[in-house]
Amino acid sequence: HMGVPFNTVQEWLKGYDASSITIGVVASHSSLQILHGARQEGFRTLGIAVGENRRRFYKAFPGADPDEWLMLEDYREMLDYAEWFREKNVIIVPHGSLVEYLGASNFRNLEVPTFGNRNILHWESSRALQRQWLEDGGCTMPKVVEDPHNIDGPVIVKYAGAKGGRGYFVARDYRDFRRNVDIEEAVSYTHLTLPTNGCV
């Protein structure tokens, strides 16, 4: 699905007050630098979050604490707030956590101006596509171990998606893998093989 047509985004932007742009971002580890940079450039900032814990966390980072918060029950509610975002001259700056929480398809259909190419986030949401892109570009890539039973030397194991910012560990064999991985957490994800994205 192609998402929002470019000429539609252009029409929305014609209605924006260029002197009063607000940079909106889903609050996660990925957004601290975005919020800090937006503030340094003189933009108002909007943090979008589910749960009060996020809000409290940002108070510890004065340069990255948003000017305003939009608190939601579920990130998919962003789709319902599109007109509200546009009325506030919001430009959404996407990042990996937004794709993880909202979904690439929902993001492509979000009726709000965004920074960058919406379709590139389809690649952001897929490790396999990222790998293909790098291999097609001639990059040498580490071997992927699909099945943890096949670990026969040191591998780096990484959780996929938003959990990927934490949860790295090294395993030497299957037993080591089992000792380190939180199986209960792994099973709660849609990809049962997510902790096997290891590299030699």
Residue map of PLM features:
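Catalytic core of tubulin tyrosine ligase-like
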Residues: E184-A186
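Positively charged, low-complexity intrinsically disordered leader regions
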Residues: M2-Q10
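Short beta-strand "acidic-cap" motif of Rossmann-like dinucleotide-binding folds
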Residues: G47
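Conserved small/polar residues in nucleotide/adenosyl-binding loops
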Residues: T190-T196
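Conserved N-proximal alpha/beta basic substrate-recognition cap immediately N-terminal to
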Residues: V50-I156, A162-K163, D173
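N-terminal phosphate-binding or glycine-rich loops at protein starts, especially the Walker A/P-loop
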Residues: V9-R39
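Glycine-rich phosphate-binding loop of ATP-grasp-fold ATP-dependent ligases
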Residues: P154-D182, L192
